[in-house]
């Protein structure tokens, strides 16, 4: 029987030796639903972070980074007492007695409007990978990511892409008919996967909950 610690904690984690859990690597995230590493190592670790009311986001995670929740949702100010009406001002730096105190809160590289807004793109970002495969040459070096569904009741998952930028938000678009992949998926998209060659897959279901036998895995291939 192993009665010792069930895992190790890197001694350079930002909260080691100070108030807070030693396990914490980054914070200020609302619901980091999935994470993935750039297999080429250029951008490191991505986290898709499901928003509360207005914005979905994807961030690049760094050691000790504070991503602003719950004073920011995406790049926008957030008020937990009134989540549908962003305040005009909010903190923009890390507070005292926190790792990286005095440094700027970290904004996402991708954000888009949630379906709870009139012009929302969909319900919950579910996964994303920096594409390093070869089959979809036009998407090489782009972040490909998934949306659970266009609306909360119908299986209308969607796929998007974002082009990395040196600063600010990455330019994004939807994968639609006529593009390398038709991203208008007639299923709920539960998540994505990546194989040893960098090619991408999506896991889907036609049910909103884990029932039935409609689960499928699809590989993204050129049209």
Tell where the protein language model's regions lie, with residue ranges.
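C-terminal structured "cap/appendage" subdomains that terminate the fold
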Residues: 166, 175-198
């Amino acid at each position: 029987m192993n009665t010792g610690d069930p895992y190790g904690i890197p001694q350079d984690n930002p909260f080691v030796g100070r108030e807070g859990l030693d396990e914490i690597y980054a914070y200020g995230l609302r619901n980091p639903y999935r994470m993935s590493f750039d297999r080429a190592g250029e951008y490191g670790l991505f986290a898709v972070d499901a928003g509360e009311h207005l914005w979905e986001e994807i961030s690049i995670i760094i050691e000790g980074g504070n991503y602003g929740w719950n004073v920011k949702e995406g790049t926008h100010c957030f008020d937990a007492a009134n989540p549908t009406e962003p305040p005009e001002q909010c903190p923009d730096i890390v507070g005292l007695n926190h790792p990286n105190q005095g440094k700027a809160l970290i904004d996402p590289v991708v954000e888009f409007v949630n379906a709870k807004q009139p012009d929302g793109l969909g319900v919950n970002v579910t996964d994303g990978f920096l594409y390093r495969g070869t089959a979809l040459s036009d998407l090489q070096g782009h972040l490909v990511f998934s949306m659970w569904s266009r609306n909360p009741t119908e299986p209308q998952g969607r796929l998007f892409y974002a082009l990395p930028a040196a600063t600010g938000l990455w330019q994004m678009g939807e994968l639609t008919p006529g593009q390398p992949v038709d991203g208008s998926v007639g299923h709920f998209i539960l998540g994505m996967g990546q194989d040893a060659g960098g090619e991408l897959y999506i896991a889907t279901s036609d049910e909103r909950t884990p029932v039935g036998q409609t689960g499928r895995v699809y590989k993204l291939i050129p049209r």
